């Protein structure tokens, strides 16, 4: 995992997320979002992810939550505001943490949340520190997902829960085109790999988690997948020109390419999205 490259990507792309993704919503979210029959717009979908995960993990005001890979604090703020949980958000991006602290003050929940620049693979927190470890689309950046799971298990209290929402591979790519799609997506999103649902479930169980449950949410992110695709198809020519003129980092072209191919990968049955839950007994 190239931590500096990942931090730079999120730092540089922050304005794009603000203008094209979470828009005027107060989700401050950098993830896909879950859609149901009542969902009207992307802001609702982004908040739905928090609701679904919090319900599955049964988060209450008695819980201390580690938001691993917190971005600019969207989920942390939501958990503090709506669940009154004590939340610690961590990210490897100093700019994200600075923004998260500002948003916490504006939302008047800074007494419940704290943010720090910390690598989720090496947190430095004492054993048995948290009731819940929460991660949305951050574990995907780890070279070995097992390394994240081991650290999460270590910092969880006995009886603690882990809840993860992320991208997965529903099946290994078979055709040359499918392999090209996956390679382009990995490159653009700075991903070393993605696990299948079965591989990740097995990794959780080997780490020691019990009551591991897999929720395939691929269908529920489809509107966001298509939205990401349309934005990137529209923006790609402009991004290429801007990169050539050194107006934006060249890495943006690969990011746009990733957005363009992920829709086809999902439609082909290769790309997927899911929520993983487990408990430390």
Task: Enumerate the predicted regions with their spans.
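N-terminal auxiliary segments of SAM/dcSAM-dependent transferases
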Residues: 1-21
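Class I SAM-dependent methyltransferase SAM/SAH-binding core
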Residues: 64-122
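A short glycine-rich, Lys/Arg-flanked "PGG" loop and its adjoining helix->strand segment in the class I
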Residues: 146-161
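Short, glycine-/aromatic-enriched active-site segment of Class I SAM-dependent methyltransferases
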Residues: 168-192, 204
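Short alpha-helix
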Residues: 192-208
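Conserved Class I S-adenosyl-L-methionine
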Residues: 213-281
